[in-house]
Amino acid sequence: MASIFSRIVAGEIPSYKIAEDEHYYAFLDINPVAPGHTLVIPKHEVDYIFDLDDEEYAGLMAFAKRVAAAIKEAMPCVKVGVTVLGLEVPHAHVHLVPLQKETDMNFFRQKLTLPAFVRIALYLN
């Protein structure tokens, strides 16, 4: 069965797309730790990020770097934090989080409302 992220890439589940190319896809996290929290995934489904071959891994990180630069330009933040957790969805992914302070990487926060998602997605696009 396809992961939820593969279903997002296939268009079966809606997302707030931030960036896309032939191999990678970036979209707003539905349970963000900060406004602009974005997930970056390979379109090719692989559960564990370190199971990606070297070329795919390097491509994913280069794509994430470009997305992080766009987030940094569009969102008020000091830096864009990056983390890989990988336990919640069996599809390799990178979290990009606009940061004001280290505690902004707290992954136990309240969910955003639909209007907030729309506003942030429009701002980042």
Protein language model regions, located:
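HIT superfamily nucleotide-processing domains
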Residues: 1-125
